Amino acid sequence: MENKFELCPKCGSKNIKWCNGKKWLCPDCGFDLYCNVAAAVGIVLYDNYDNVLFEVRAKEPRKGFLCLPGGFVDPDESAEDAVVRECREEMGAQIKEDKFLCSFPNTYVYKNIEYKTCDLFFTAKLPEEFKDMDDFVKTLRREESEVVGFEVRHISSVEEVEALPLAFTSAHKTLLRFLEVK
């Protein structure tokens, strides 16, 4: 991330500096502003037939690419609560996360600003009332501002993961980890 500030927000000095890739510091008044990592969540929702549910992104970054259901963690919200909320908002589905799978750093570029994130991924098995993922998808209501549609992909090999047009490298790494532990 480069320094986007031209003036110190506290004293107005033009001497504000970007330090060590972590914070802005004004040597004139001592103001410092840390650029902390944002927390984001995603879920690998799978069925008994090695099918995984993906969303098709409706907006940048990476509009039109596949992603795992999820999003940013809100202030004062746990990662577990965030993934349940995101599934409800984006898909109209009540999903209970099964277990924590992994986390990976990610870079999220939005409106030409680079945000560093820590993406936390969970797994959940398809709710028992559905015979398979296609049956489940028929019940979903997409959040139009976030999701163009849903895709079900068979994921049982590294080659199948490599062939996916994924929006984010953290999802790619997560699916490889999912294959290792399932």
What are these regions (language model features)?
Residues 42, 53-56, 138-139:
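Beta-strand scaffold of nucleotide-dependent catalytic cores
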Residues 47-89:
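Conserved Nudix-box catalytic region and its N-terminal flanking loop in Nudix hydrolases
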Residues 37, 64, 114-118:
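Residue-level preference for beta-strand/loop junctions
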Residues 45-46, 54, 124, 152:
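Conserved hydrophobic "DFG−1" position in protein kinase catalytic cores
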Residues 73-99, 104-167:
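Unchanged
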Residues 28, 57, 70, 152-157:
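Active-site donor-binding loop signature of nucleotide-sugar glycosyltransferases
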Residues 167-182:
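Charged phosphate-binding loop/patch that engages nucleotide di/tri-phosphates or the phosphate backbone
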Residues 1-43, 48:
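Acidic, metal-coordinating catalytic segment for phosphate/diphosphate chemistry
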